[in-house]
């Protein structure tokens, strides 16, 4: 995603080295890959309404405008199990699980090929964790998504993953 530049090693996507990609080329690549952050409390801009947060990617990537954005945001909210009438609310008005659903909707908005799910349930109550994991699984089946799941919780990995790589000190060891 190039949120930070790599300090060592190389990252490739579809045979293209990501280091050095800039401008429109980087924006085009980012449409294909999205992220769901670990902490739903700090990953949503507190000054933006939910509808704006989710619709922002649609506008940045010229995928929709005006009423089209509103319709797509409503569709995405429903897709992740939230009512479309929450679009005008702010992130602080939601629980952690609801915020993570908003983050998932935001990631889905641009129809990515894959989503990096960085510890997507570690900051949530145990009672909510399985709901979010099951939502991610349902979305994977419905849209043919690929997830790169980052997790220290082996139960989460077992529930979600079809292939696993174990890393230690920045290297795949298993």
Predicted segment positions?
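Conserved ABC transporter NBD signature motif
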Residues: 9-17, 29
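Conserved ABC ATPase "signature" region
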Residues: 17, 67-85
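Conserved signature/switch motifs of ABC ATPase nucleotide-binding domains
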Residues: 31, 92, 110, 134, ...
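Conserved ABC ATPase signature
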Residues: 90-94, 98
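Hydrophobic anchor residue at the start of the ABC signature
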Residues: 104, 132
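A short, proline-enriched helix->beta-strand linker immediately N-terminal to the Walker B motif
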Residues: 109-113, 129
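A short, surface-exposed alpha-helical micro-motif characterized by mixed small hydrophobic
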Residues: 157-159
């Amino acid at each position: 995603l190039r949120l930070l530049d790599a300090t060592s090693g190389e990252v490739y996507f579809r045979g293209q080295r990501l280091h050095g990609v800039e401008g429109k080329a980087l924006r085009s690549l980012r449409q294909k890959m999205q992220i769901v952050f670990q902490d739903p409390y700090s990953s949503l801009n507190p000054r933006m309404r939910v509808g704006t947060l989710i619709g922002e990617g649609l506008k940045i990537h010229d995928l929709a405008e005006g009423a089209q954005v509103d319709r797509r945001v409503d569709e995405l909210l429903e897709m992740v199990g939230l009512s479309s009438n929450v679009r005008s609310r702010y992130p602080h008005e939601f629980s952690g699980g609801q915020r993570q659903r908003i983050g998932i909707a935001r990631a889905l908005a641009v129809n990515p090929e894959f989503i990096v799910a960085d510890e997507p349930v570690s900051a949530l109550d145990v009672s909510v964790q399985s709901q979010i994991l099951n939502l991610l699984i349902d979305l994977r089946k419905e849209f043919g998504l690929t997830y790169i799941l980052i997790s220290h919780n082996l139960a989460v990995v077992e529930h979600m993953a079809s292939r696993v790589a174990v890393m230690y000190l920045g290297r795949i060891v298993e």
